[in-house]
From Swiss-Prot:
Pfam families: p450 (PF00067). Changing A150D: In allele CYP6D1v1. This is Cytochrome P450 6d1. Changing M55L: In allele CYP6D1v3 and allele CYP6D1v5. Keywords: Endoplasmic reticulum, Heme, Iron, Membrane, Metal-binding, Microsome, Monooxygenase, Oxidoreductase. Its EC number is 1.14.-.-. It comes from Musca domestica. It is found in: Endoplasmic reticulum membrane; Microsome membrane. Belongs to the cytochrome P450 family. PROSITE patterns: CYTOCHROME_P450 (PS00086). InterPro entries: Cyt_P450 (IPR001128), Cyt_P450_CS (IPR017972), Cyt_P450_E_grp-I (IPR002401), Cyt_P450_sf (IPR036396), Insect_CytP450_Detox (IPR050476). The gene is CYP6D1. Gene3D superfamilies: Cytochrome P450 (1.10.630.10). Induction: By phenobarbital in susceptible strains (3-fold in CS), but not in the LPR strain. GO terms for molecular function: heme binding; iron ion binding; monooxygenase activity; oxidoreductase activity, acting on paired donors, with incorporation or reduction of molecular oxygen.
Length: 516
């Protein structure tokens, strides 16, 4: 009797699982072959391949505009068509306005940042933060960025002081550069991780991006943020919160208290957050921007310490990795394309001369803006190596796929494989080649609808211009002062990483030598 009961239970579960994992086929969608209970995530679960590459693999092997996938037990849809992807992000934004990620503003305020917030809360915060990254604000922060770039230059000069060519792992060096920019511009800290790598902020950064130093519960909780937000909310309320985020909150709190107590004012993003907290808005008047810190009782809650900390943490996560990756991948590709390297280096030299600047001296915002070919290089790098290899959205109302009879059900998770689209030859001819000229006005050779490394529409990356500026500053410093040694062309291999970024298996090793 017991054996029969067990057989009935197992059979019932099997039938239920088969029905669950054939949902998309029954609804008429092309579907990735799913395994029970891992769905499309077997290689992710076994740490064989990162999630972004798994989505790109499915993109490559399937054929229809929309493909059914299973994120473990969660049915979702992968969009394989650039026009449809852009439509979801822009014209039909009202049907896909949320990301569907974990957020719990009330009980876990450090989870409530611009990236994950939903509905009116997101709209209000986006509107308030938008002025933070205007041209005037970036120009005001430029000196701080240039100070960090000078430390990068000093570090490289010290590593190459014997005048010989040396192979350096450039990604780790540029990660230090990016982290110090974030620490200074966003957290308001005076740090030099090149000289003092054991400072509190750098140590927290290493722990954050090194999953080996997190517990199994933390890793499971981080995965549930994306796969199953209700479970993440439950785990959070049971105490499974990331201690690093709260350590960073303490840093923000101490810095704000110090500034307000001592009357310290700096031209950085934290100062803008303080202004938003105290006045309810960020001024558009550049002359008053950094000094308008008077507060009123009703506006003190406009941006709490927790909200400042959570959004600082967001810009830290997004800004440090994307800046380091974009800059290092650009250097790596230039080493494999000497003719492109020569053109980029010549432009930097000419711009410095035109603006009356010296290679080892200070840069200016205007000079960086004048480096147009460097812009093309950054565009090509972010095409081939998007900072986030995929975008995600949640369908908030039933949506009919254009020119089909297919309907995307409400609450369905949507994945857009940027890596797949950006390396699709129908949108970008010869996608494996590094060709900055494909973006030049006079020789455009790509489908503009398919290029979206920072997202598109109302939820596009708010700090896009800052990230590009930070990368261009580092590139200009390196190209102006060092020779990059040519090397054979070879595609980068990526290893498994729990973070949704592209991590090279063996780093990015490039030969550098002094020019002067």
């Amino acid at each position: 009797m017991l054996l029969l009961l067990l057989l009935i239970v197992v059979t019932t579960l099997y039938i239920f699982a088969k029905l669950h994992y054939t949902k998309w086929e029954r609804l008429g969608f092309e579907s990735d072959k799913a395994t029970i209970p891992l769905g499309s995530m077997a290689k992710v679960f076994h740490k064989e391949r990162p999630f972004g590459l798994v989505m790109s693999d499915i993109y490559d092997k399937c054929h229809e505009k929309v493909v059914g996938i299973y994120l473990f037990f969660k049915p979702a849809l992968l969009v394989r068509d650039a026009e449809l992807a852009r439509q979801i992000l822009t014209t039909d934004f009202n049907s896909f306005h949320d990301r569907g990620l974990y957020v719990d503003e009330k009980n876990d305020p450090m989870s409530a940042n611009l990236f994950v917030m939903e509905g009116q809360s997101w709209r209000t915060l986006r509107m308030k933060l938008a002025p933070s990254f205007s041209s005037g604000k970036l120009k005001g922060m430029f000196e701080t960025v240039d100070d960090v770039a000078a430390k990068l230059l000093n570090h490289l000069n010290e590593r190459l002081k014997d005048g010989q060519s040396h192979v350096l792992e450039i990604k780790s060096i540029l990660t230090t550069y990016a982290v110090d920019i974030i620490g200074s511009v966003i957290f308001g800290l005076e740090i030099d991780s090149f000289t003092h790598p054991d400072n509190e902020f750098r140590v927290l950064s290493d722990r954050l991006f090194n999953p080996k130093k997190s517990t199994m519960l933390q890793r499971f909780r981080n995965l549930s943020n994306f796969i199953c937000p209700p479970l993440a909310k439950l785990l959070s309320r049971l105490g499974a919160k990331d201690p690093i985020t709260y350590r960073l909150r303490d840093i923000v709190k101490r810095t704000i208290e110090f500034r307000e107590e001592k009357g310290v004012v700096r031209k950085d993003l934290l100062q803008l957050f303080i202004q938003l907290r105290n006045t309810g808005k960020i001024s558009d008047d550049n002359d008053k921007l950094w000094h308008d810190v008077e507060s009123t009782a009703e506006n003190l809650k406009a941006m709490s310490i927790d909200m400042i900390a959570s959004n600082s943490f967001l810009f830290y996560i997004a800004g440090s990795e994307t800046t380091a990756a974009t800059t290092s991948f650009t250097i790596y590709e230039l080493a494999m394309y000497p003719e492109i390297l020569k053109k980029a280096q010549s432009e930097v030299d000419e711009c410095l001369q035109r603006h009356g600047l010296k290679p080892q001296g200070r840069l200016t915002y205007e000079a960086i803006q004048d480096m147009k070919y460097l812009d093309l290089c950054v565009m090509e790098t972010t095409r081939k190596y998007p900072g986030l290899p995929f975008l995600n959205r949640k369908c908030t109302q039933d949506f009919q796929v254009p020119d089909t009879k297919l309907t995307i059900p409400k609450e369905t998770g949507i994945i857009i494989s940027l890596l797949g689209i950006h390396r699709d030859p129908q949108y970008f001819p010869q996608p494996e080649d590094y060709r900055p000229e494909r973006f030049a006005d006079e020789s455009k050779d790509y489908d503009p609808a398919a290029y979206m490394p920072f997202g598109e529409g109302p939820r596009h990356c708010i700090a896009q211009r800052m990230g590009v500026m930070n990368s261009k500053v580092a590139l200009a410093k390196i190209l102006a002062n060092f020779n990059i040694q040519p090397m054979p062309r070879q595609e980068v291999e990526f290893k498994f990483h729990s973070a949704p970024v592209l991590v090279p298996v063996n780093g990015l090793n490039v030969g550098l030598s002094k020019r002067w």
